[in-house]
């Protein structure tokens, strides 16, 4: 099928067990784009469609338009089959909240289409390729620790990848997830959040961590010297009412450290009367 229709995505859905996992490991999957563990969750079908759409539209939407990207690095079929529906549900819900400020249906649709993309990497090389290509629009990274690197399973591949990312970008939000608690020490060294894959409330923990670190939800400007909050921006009206009281040093602090999924905050950084020291910020 793949030889006849190379541009049509092919996805395999299978109930998962240890026997199925062993068989898949031995099969030639070169003709398959993705394999997912099917447990009857219909949200997985939506996530698969969105994942394929994001991959196909990434070149134009990210490079040309400036849409941002969340990168998931994970090779466990069972795990990414569980996480992706939760991740997409969260991103779509946040986009719906943002779109409620739209003036009409057309603008609302455009805001929904401008949601952050989600891309899946299953090897070290695939993760590096995506990061190198879209690093300027990366909103955050969620990475496993153990996955394939240079053709073999590397128990520290995720740490090596995140170490490289951190050397390129000191402030990009990183979430390291692992079933081995000792990897939490490595996450702390990289100034990354750590999630235990064995936790029964992992999906909840992931949503909370992304909400806190990836710039979703209400945005609070803080005093960079004291850490005290200055003002919280919930929507464009709040931004308009409080724009005059935000100090330049607070703006510089936030603009130089993170990217934001909320377009109103990014527009603020672009329109602000910038001193010379702000000219090189990646707005």
Regions found by a protein language model. Give the residues of each.
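Acidic, metal-coordinating helix/loop segments flanking the phosphotransfer/catalytic sites
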Residues: 98-140
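Alpha4 helix (beta4-alpha4-beta5 surface) of REC/receiver domains from two-component response regulators
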Residues: 3-4, 12-37, 42-46, 57-59, ...
